[in-house]
Amino acid sequence: MRMIDIIEKKRDGHTLTTEEINFFIDGYVKGDIPDYQASSLAMAIYFQDMNDDERAALTMAMVNSGDMIDLSDIKGVKVDKHSTGGVGDTTTLVLAPLVAAVDVPVAKMSGRGLGHTGGTIDKLEAIDGFHVEIDEATFVKLVNENKVAVVGQSGNLTPADKKIYALRDVTGTVNSIPLIASSIMSKKIAAGADAIVLDVKTGSGAFMKTLEDAEALAHAMVRIGNNVGRNTMAIISDMNQPLGRAIGNALELQEAIDTLKGQGPKDLTELVLTLGSQMVVLANKAETLEEARALLIEAIDSGAALEKFKTFIKNQGGDETVIDHPERLPQAQYQIEYKAKKSGYVTELVSNDIGVASMMLGAGRLTKEDDIDLAVGIVLNKKIGDKVEEGESLLTIHSNRQDVDDVVKKLDSSITIADHVVSPTLIHKIITE
């Protein structure tokens, strides 16, 4: 088999066999196939696309290129959730203890964040003493006993994906549905998930700007999952504004605690209930989405979800008293109100700009080596559709420096107030095939 034949076959719009895809992935990871041939195939895939069988084969070839996490000692159906990312996306912090409270095992591997705010692990490390460096045996034991644990990423998972991802970045092949879908799904499958729930974001603050593109990606990932024996569902949710009100690590953790108490922002609560219902159904803990939703609401109302979060924090060395004493979380030195320059209705909150403003305060990383300031960030006091009076606070800047002129300048271009009302949609579609 020769790589040039595989490139020409895809260039001419033909279907690659599983053997050909395996040959490419295997050779590329070993270093036998050079970058210039791999980038040539990536471009051919970009223009000619792949069918469902090719996409599934590419995903599994990437899974098999490295280690796979074995979660077979954990009882029950392991359901993992993946979000394509957004600003203020606090869902994992709420979802993990919430679905665990209704007996769904959550064995979460998480990374540190690059970009606007930290990843799930950074947010949890805002809790004094919390750690994710636990060995596999402890991880399995914690999930079996308490239904939820979070561990840092380890092992050599999907090395093929890492290489192809870096290559796509510099060869103009990032926006290819088969390449994005196989990249995301290979990581989830390698991490040991039996079933997968996907939150595909669309809108100005999302990777997929249009609903059409988001749908195409959601269908692609759901089909890959179902084709390789992992029950998969997706929802398409809106990222035309940040989710919830908090952007920043300790601030988002506080918001997660509020949400588990039933006092969280409406949009975050709704998204969590929608995603959580799918997880509960896929874990065979409820027959219908309606029944699953009722179980989750009951877990919040009864305090079971909050109790689960406490035990989870304690199990991983954290100070669980922060649940009842949020003032023990890292606090920024200055709270600066950003006020409306005119009266009207909020019609636009540019997610990415608000995310960047939060990063300028120190809430996120530009490079892997950067330190994060866990206390800083932004809290939105108004969301799209809200009425606002001139001089009223639109958002609060939590900062450890007094001079935030650069941040204010960034925010000036990210908020629009007009004289008409805009009603945002949160959940656009649910995709099951």
From Swiss-Prot:
Tell me where on the tree of life, at the top rank, the source sits.
Bacteria
Binding of phosphate: at which residues? K81, H82, S83, T92, K108, M109, S110, T120
Q: What is its EC number?
A: 2.4.2.2
Per UniProt, the cofactor note for this protein states: Binds 1 K(+) ion per subunit.
Keywords for this protein: Glycosyltransferase, Metal-binding, Potassium, Transferase
Q: Name one Pfam family in it.
A: Glycos_transf_3
Residues annotated for K(+) binding in this entry: G88, T90, L243, A246, E255
| GO CC terms of this entry | cytosol
Catalysis: reaction(s):
uridine + phosphate = alpha-D-ribose 1-phosphate + uracil; thymidine + phosphate = 2-deoxy-alpha-D-ribose 1-phosphate + thymine; 2'-deoxyuridine + phosphate = 2-deoxy-alpha-D-ribose 1-phosphate + uracil
Q: Name one GO biological process term.
A: pyrimidine nucleobase metabolic process
The record's annotation in InterPro entries points to: Glycosyl_Trfase_fam3, Glycosyl_Trfase_fam3_N_dom, Glycosyl_Trfase_fam3_N_dom_sf, Nuc_phospho_transferase, PYNP-like_C_sf, PYNP_C, Pyrmidine_PPas_bac/euk, Pyrmidine_PPase_CS
> Which cofactors does it use?
K(+)
The enzyme's first-digit EC class, named in words, is transferase
Residues annotated to bind substrate: R168, K187
Task: Give one GO term, molecular function aspect.
Answer: deoxyuridine phosphorylase activity
Q: Which PANTHER family match?
A: THYMIDINE PHOSPHORYLASE
Q: Outline the subunit composition.
A: Homodimer.
Q: What role does it play?
A: Catalyzes phosphorolysis of the pyrimidine nucleosides uridine, thymidine and 2'-deoxyuridine with the formation of the corresponding pyrimidine base and ribose-1-phosphate.
Which family is it part of?
Belongs to the thymidine/pyrimidine-nucleoside phosphorylase family.
Protein name (database record): Pyrimidine-nucleoside phosphorylase
Please state the gene responsible for encoding this protein: pdp
